[in-house]
């Protein structure tokens, strides 16, 4: 029996013999593709190749790609654990042709690998295929060349309610590459229920799709239109876990070798004896996706990819709760996962400490609200009518207790109850509108600019170049000519302008020529071409004209200093805080630098000083900043850091600063570290769970900042009538005096209040032999009010005291009740009723309670209400 690791290797070996380049799996976070939450198919890393925007030194490739499907269009989360084949994390085996072979070879390759005794050796009679209804070419290849009988070839049309919406018309997302496909199914046999694809029983488990071969012919735009791709290509995908189940003679993916150890470990940690329990499957699946997402740089959060990760973690924790887990358990699966996936050929061992820590923190945080949330849900489900949980309750669970909707849906499904998702969405939208802030978006040219060829970048050695205009874009479309005052994007054949990348802003400057001048305000990269974004200041500009491209040198110089300082800062952070520190984002401009990084606790002042000193030490060392082009793998072997989320070519630019910093970087830098002059950290904050942010300035900006701080100190010293070195001592003296004066004032207030209390005791009215005082005492703070109430309770044997006070535009309410009356009048109940009259809330003990409010105009009404209520209840 072949192991999963052996199957993976045999697939790669087979296609290598067919002239395919073996390409490593890309990260789970797609590189430079905002249309995807996660890598969900093998072809994601080749999207730009299919679109003709990127070129590789090979035209055939094969991969074993790590994938996650738990958000967006491809979302398997709700099915995971309840079916035999759905996963959040899986591996997709694939072979790809970039304008090389097409349908004939793709089909023959697939059949040979599956049926040849040298490879998988599956019985041919066990295999069925489907083709797109109008794809006669694919049908004939299967039938006439491969020899699959017509009764085992099924045509599938548009079965999803729209043109090209079919099980046999594949698309990566709402936009992007797409085309007809042919799928290969394995027949498990008559002993398992189910029918062939296209039949009413197709959802059964007898016929299982094992391979999808996509004939990539089109690029779908946001408006639904499709244009032919430059060259027809092939994209195939075969789920490793599915084919392993077939070859290991089991009907469920959860019974294959890589899942058995994980399920056994979950059972051990939770004490579950029944190894068929679906919760074991859920947790075994989820630890794979969670660990690999964290290893690839995703941090649990409340938005985007981080929220999907949080949903998966919380779903796993809840299933652990179902199994009886009494303490944090999920993170304890990581060592077993590393062992299992190491056997399978991939691992997260290098990130083990970070993965375990984040999982443990997230689990412990959710555990604090899980029990209370489940109690609320149980109560709500007990009162459900018509078998549906209200959207309002589901939203409260989400908003207050951190229950993702799919977690609530899991609980409801176990009790055959549905959720009012329309109501939930309505509540979510209402919250979004409440929190919405205005935002402006400029013209997005990413899906508009499609230009043949590429722009040659000359900016490493030049700041001025002669260049030819190859294309113009204005108002979201290509044009041949622009006039003065018109905003546009200018594409050049060559350019000294740096296009925004790696956190560094794009260059600005001018494109000048005879009779015209174009101001470049930003530079962006669109595929292989550089777009110079700006406005034509004078004259007219047409495609084909020559321009003198001149970069704003001062702005670029300041930007380069900040970029070089960012590299030093990154290295210093790793040296002081630990090797777990990785870049999570950056912004390098001519004004300042911003650096986001993974770190799970606050940075101390001493650490921050050490980091800053280390950076400036390297600046003073005046290292030569060297760049070298080399192969990506050689650069990594040399120790160069490849930053998460960046897309690198096979040949990369390695930037070194002495022996202190070595990174892959395509940005513009200083010539020596000494050019930076000075680096000053201005702020350090947390921006999300596990993510910190440092902002800093360099060079002249840093000196200017220091001068401002020095002036501020001098001004403060003048106000304090002190010298600069004695400011802290002087402030401490003033604080001590202020505290002393405050205490003396409080004593006077309390004396005054007690005197007022004696007067108030004489004014008490009787209601059924109970002394009642209801008064407004303006300007009396809450502490003094408590003193007066306690004094009056001691003076009066049986009493209820109600005071209202307005201090600094806020209403303070206090109710005191002597112990003999708390069975009749509870201070907390009465003060809450009064608080409602003034737009507030409060609470406390039965004999003493306080509240606050904001509606000053209703104070008299509240006191009148108190008198009436006491007459009715005493």
UniProtKB/Swiss-Prot annotation:
Keywords: Aminoacyl-tRNA synthetase, ATP-binding, Cytoplasm, Ligase, Metal-binding, Nucleotide-binding, Protein biosynthesis, RNA-binding, tRNA-binding, Zinc. It is found in: Cytoplasm. Its cofactor is Zn(2+). GO terms for biological process: alanyl-tRNA aminoacylation; negative regulation of DNA-templated transcription. It catalyses: tRNA(Ala) + L-alanine + ATP = L-alanyl-tRNA(Ala) + AMP + diphosphate. GO terms for molecular function: alanine-tRNA ligase activity; aminoacyl-tRNA deacylase activity; ATP binding; tRNA binding; zinc ion binding. Binds 1 zinc ion per subunit. Its EC number is 6.1.1.7. Its main location: cytoplasm. Zn(2+) binds at residues 563, 567, 665, 669. It comes from the Bacteria. GO terms for cellular component: cytosol. Consists of three domains; the N-terminal catalytic domain, the editing domain and the C-terminal C-Ala domain. The editing domain removes incorrectly charged amino acids, while the C-Ala domain, along with tRNA(Ala), serves as a bridge to cooperatively bring together the editing and aminoacylation centers thus stimulating deacylation of misacylated tRNAs. Catalyzes the attachment of alanine to tRNA(Ala) in a two-step reaction: alanine is first activated by ATP to form Ala-AMP and then transferred to the acceptor end of tRNA(Ala). Also edits incorrectly charged Ser-tRNA(Ala) and Gly-tRNA(Ala) via its editing domain. Belongs to the class-II aminoacyl-tRNA synthetase family. This is Alanine--tRNA ligase. It comes from Pasteurella multocida (strain Pm70). The lineage of its organism: Bacteria, Pseudomonadati, Pseudomonadota, Gammaproteobacteria, Pasteurellales.
């Amino acid at each position: 029996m072949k192991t999963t690791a052996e199957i993976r290797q045999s697939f790669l070996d087979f296609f290598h013999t067919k002239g395919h380049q073996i390409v490593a799996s890309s990260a789970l976070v797609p590189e430079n593709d905002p249309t995807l939450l996660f890598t969900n198919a093998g072809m994601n890393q080749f999207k730009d190749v299919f679109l003709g925007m990127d070129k590789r030194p090979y035209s055939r490739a094969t991969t074993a790609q790590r994938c996650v499907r738990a958000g967006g269009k491809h979302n398997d989360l709700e099915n995971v654990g309840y079916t035999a084949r759905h996963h959040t994390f899986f591996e997709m085996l694939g072979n790809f042709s970039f304008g090389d072979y097409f349908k004939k070879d793709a089909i023959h390759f697939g059949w040979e690998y599956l049926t040849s005794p040298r490879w998988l050796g599956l019985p041919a009679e066990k295999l069925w295929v489907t083709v797109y209804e109008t794809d006669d070419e694919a049908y004939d290849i299967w039938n006439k060349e491969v020899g699959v009988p017509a009764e085992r070839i099924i045509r599938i049309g548009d079965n999803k309610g729209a043109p090209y919406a079919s099980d046999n018309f594949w698309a990566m997302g709402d936009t992007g590459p797409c085309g007809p496909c042919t799928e290969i199914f394995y027949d498990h046999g008559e002993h398992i229920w189910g029918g062939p694809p296209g039949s009413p029983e197709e959802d059964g488990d007898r016929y299982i799709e094992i391979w999808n071969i996509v004939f990539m012919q089109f690029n779908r735009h946001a408006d639904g239109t499709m244009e032919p791709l430059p060259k027809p290509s092939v994209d195939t995908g075969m789920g490793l876990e599915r084919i392993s189940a077939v070859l290991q003679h089991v009907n469920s993916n959860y019974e294959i070798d890589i899942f058995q150890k994980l399920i056994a470990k979950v059972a051990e940690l939770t004490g579950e004896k029944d190894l068929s329990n679906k919760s074991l499957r859920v947790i075994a699946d989820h630890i794979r996706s969670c660990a690999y997402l964290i290893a690839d740089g995703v941090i649990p959060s409340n938005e985007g990819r981080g929220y999907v990760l949080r949903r998966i973690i919380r779903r796993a924790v809840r299933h652990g709760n179902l199994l009886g887990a009494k303490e944090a358990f999920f993170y304890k699966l990581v060592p077993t996962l590393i062992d299992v996936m190491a056997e399978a050929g991939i691992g997260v061992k290098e990130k083990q400490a970070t993965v375990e820590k984040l999982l443990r923190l997230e689990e412990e945080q959710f555990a604090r609200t899980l029990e209370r949330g489940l109690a609320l849900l149980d109560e709500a489900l007990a009162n459900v009518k018509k078998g549906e949980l209200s959207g309002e309750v589901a939203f409260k669970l989400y908003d207050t207790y951190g229950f993702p909707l799919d977690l609530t849906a899991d609980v409801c499904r176990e009790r055959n109850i549905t959720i009012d998702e329309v109501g939930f969405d309505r509540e979510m939208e209402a919250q979004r509108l409440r929190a919405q802030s205005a935002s402006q978006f400029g013209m997005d040219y990413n899906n508009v600019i499609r230009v043949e060829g590429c722009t040659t970048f000359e900016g490493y050695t030049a700041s001025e170049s002669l260049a030819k205009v190859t294309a113009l874009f204005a108002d979201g479309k290509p044009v041949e000519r622009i006039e003065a005052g018109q905003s546009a994007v200018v594409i050049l054949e060559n350019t000294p302008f740096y296009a925004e990348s790696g956190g560094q802003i794009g260059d600005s400057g001018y494109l000048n020529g005879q009779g015209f001048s174009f101001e470049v305000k930003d530079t962006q990269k669109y595929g292989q071409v550089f777009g110079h974004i700006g406005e034509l200041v004078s004259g007219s500009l047409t495609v084909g004209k020559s321009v003198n491209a001149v970069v704003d040198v001062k702005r670029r110089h300041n930007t380069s200093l900040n970029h070089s300082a960012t590299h030093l800062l990154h290295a210093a952070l790793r040296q002081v805080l630990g090797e777990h520190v990785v870049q999570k984002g950056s912004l390098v401009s001519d004004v300042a630098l911003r650096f986001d990084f993974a770190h799970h606790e606050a940075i101390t002042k001493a650490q921050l000083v050490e980091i800053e000193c280390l950076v400036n030490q390297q600046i003073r060392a005046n290292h030569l900043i060297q760049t070298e082009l080399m192969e990506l793998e050689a650069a990594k072997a040399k120790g160069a850091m490849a930053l998460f989320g960046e897309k690198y070519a096979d040949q990369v630019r390695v930037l070194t600063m002495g022996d202190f910093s070595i990174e892959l970087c395509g940005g513009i830098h200083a010539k020596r570290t000494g050019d930076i002059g000075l680096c000053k950290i201005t702020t350090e904050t947390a921006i999300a769970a596990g993510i910190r942010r440092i902002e800093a300035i360099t060079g002249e900006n840093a000196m200017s900042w220091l001068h401002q701080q020095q002036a501020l100190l001098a001004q403060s010293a003048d106000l304090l009538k002190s010298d600069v070195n004695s400011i802290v001592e002087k402030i401490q003296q003033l604080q001590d005096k202020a505290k002393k004066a405050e205490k003396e004032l409080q004593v006077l207030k309390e004396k005054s209040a007690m005197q007022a209390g004696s007067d108030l005791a004489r004014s008490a009215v009787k209601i059924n032999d109970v002394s009642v005082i209801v008064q407004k005492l303006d300007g009396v703070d809450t502490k003094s009010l408590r003193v007066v109430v306690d004094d009056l309770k001691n003076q009066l044997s049986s009493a209820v005291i109600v005071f209202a006070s307005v201090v600094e535009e806020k209403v303070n309410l206090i109710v005191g009740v002597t112990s003999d009356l708390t069975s009749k009048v509870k201070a907390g109940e009465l003060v809450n009723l009064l608080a409602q009259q003034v737009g507030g809330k409060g609470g406390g003990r039965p004999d003493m309670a306080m509240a606050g409010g904001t509606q000053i105009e209703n104070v008299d009404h509240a006191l009148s209400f108190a008198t009436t209520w006491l007459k009715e209840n005493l």
